[in-house]
Each structure stands twice: as C-alpha cells, then as structure tokens.
Amino acid sequence: MKFLTALSAIGALVATATAAAVPNTPAKQSMIDVQLSATGNTMIKATITNKGDKALNLLQFNTILDKNPTRKVRVYQNGTEVKFTGMLPRYKMSNLSPEYFTSLGPKASVESTFDIARTHDLTRGGKITVMASGTIRTAEGHGANATTITGYARYESNKLELDVDAKKASSVGQAMGKVKKSRGTIDKRTNIDTSSCTQGQLDALEGALYNSAALAQAAAEAAPSNLNTVAEFFKSTSSSTVNTIVSRLQSVASESSYVDYGSTTYYCTDSMNGCSPGVLAYTLPDQNLIFNCPIYYSDLPALAQSCYEQDQATTTLHEMTHNSAVVSPFCDDLGYGYEDATSLSAAQAIQNADSYALFANGKLILHLHEKSGF
C-alpha cells in the first residue's frame, strides 16, 4: 500500500512564495445583511439581504443558508454556549454545482427558516440568546448559473433573545439522533467500525489516518520554528497560540495513530443520512463520530500533490479537529480554503478546522514511499 509521509528529518516548511499564486479574493464586508427573528418556540427565520448593486450567487455550504443540520447560529444561555448536536461537514470545493448556490439580486432578500431545537440541546428551556456570523462565498457573472468563486461576504446578525418552553423544545426530534455503535475490530488506528467498510474503503481510510498522523505530527514539530507561517494561518505568534496549535496537532496525530483504541469512532460509510451532495465527510462532535461519504473515495487523492488542494489525508485531519475528545473546544468551520481561512482573525483562526488542515497540507515537504504498515 502506498503512503505519503512528512520528512521528519527535515520537519520544515517551504517558502511562502506559493501563496502569491493564489488569486486575491476580495472580502465584501458589508454586502450581506442577516436579520434573525423568531417564528415559534425554537423556530428561527433568517432574512438574508444583498445590499449591493450586483446580483450574487451565494454558496450555501456552512452558512446560514446551508440545507444540512449544521451550526447556522450560536446559542447561548447564561453566558455559556448551548451544546450543539448537529453535523459539521467538509464539502468538496471544486467543480461546484449551481444547486449549491442561492441566487440573490441587487437589494433582494431571501428567507431561511430552521428549528434550533433540532441541532441544540434546549431541553432545559429558559432564556437564550441566538446570533449568527460567518462568511458566504460568492460567485458573480453568468446569472444564476455562476459557480466560479470570485469573492466572499462576511455577515453578523442581530442578537435574538428567546424564552424557550422546555416541554415544547424536548418534543422536537434531533436532526442527527444517536448512533448505535457496533464497532468491528482491526489491528490498528482509532476505532474504525469495520462493519461499515469494504476492503478498499478500509485500506483508503487506514492510509488517510496514517498520513493524517504524519502530517499533524510534522506540522506540530515545525510550528515553533516557523512563526511566519504560523502568523500566515493563525494571525498570531504568541506563545499561547503556538502552544495551542502544537497541542492540538499532536492530539490529532495521536488520535489518528492509536493502536486498538481511541476517543473517536470512524465509519467508512454513512449511516446517518448526512452525505448530501457535495459532502466529503462529516462529524457529529457531541458523539465523537466521523463518517466518510462516497465522494471521499471517488473524488479525492490520498494526498494532494499541490498546496491547498483537498485530499483524503487532510479531510480526515480536518474532521478530527471537529471532535471534542480530540480538540476542546472542538473546531468549527469558520473559513474554507486558503483565501477564506487566512482572512480570519486570530480568535477565529485558532478555532477553524481548515486552518489546521491547510497549515499541515500547504507548507510541509512530503515524501512518497512504499510502506506496508504503520
């Protein structure tokens, strides 16, 4: 079996010249307005308005417009964030289909309605605060069929105060539910449910975990002596930032390489109906479960041969950071891809899953060799 591993003897980062080749993607800071309102006990309506004078195609992935049970809003009670019970998907960002976009004309608005009780534990009821913030990637030109990303728009909603009826909230079914574990056994890696795998899928996942461990460990070792690159991806070189990055990457490396046990359970296939079009893999952070989707195997190489491209190894690394047993608090999807991730603030970047995946993927010197096991 072929595996890709970081050259541990070098443990260095390549020059940042490759970043110059990435097209500049302007942030339209005020192009999108998002207003939240309540339409029921836990039902939320988000009104998204294009404030500009050009039509926009808004990419739905990991935004307030996402059709999956993702983290569309933040919910707080008594100053503490309410437990999120939905899914955190990683989407394929190449060859985007028009169906992944919402078309919005100049000054036009679109509404999105969702029940936060389906993705949050609101069984206690009481007063809560709901807000939304994030980035929407935009495509311009060629009308409603535009799919080439040309920019991105940041948004921050109003704060919505609600008094939740606990009984009504408890009656709402959870979007993802609980997974009944029936783990198979293998000789190596974090808990893989082998009953969910074909031999080919198992081989691919074991290879991805091996590479995830190698990349994460090499990146952890390289970070303290490569502060310019740390600043590029995480916007800070403070000792606390570097220590957090190192600790989290080491945790990912450990979880990816545990023998016979681990804190997460990894499924080769989807048993929770989360693999909607465009989803490579997804995590249920409250249960520490990861699921691969069909296009993880069909559309991704084992490890990309150029910077910042998606692959199986860094998709697995990305998903590992979503698990609370690996990274606490678990990382979110605040910025996707190089341009978006490197435009985040320091506070956002340290909690962004793709920042770790890109840091590990984009700058490490790799070596391809034959290896039959870890």
From Swiss-Prot:
Q: Name one GO molecular function term.
A: metal ion binding
- Under which EC number(s) is this enzyme classified? 3.4.24.39
Reactions catalysed: Preferential cleavage of bonds with hydrophobic residues in P1'. Also 3-Asn-|-Gln-4 and 8-Gly-|-Ser-9 bonds in insulin B chain
Q: Which GO terms describe its biological process?
A: proteolysis
Q: What class of enzyme is it?
A: hydrolase
Provide the family line. Answer: Belongs to the peptidase M35 family.
How is this protein named in the record? Probable neutral protease 2 homolog ARB_00849
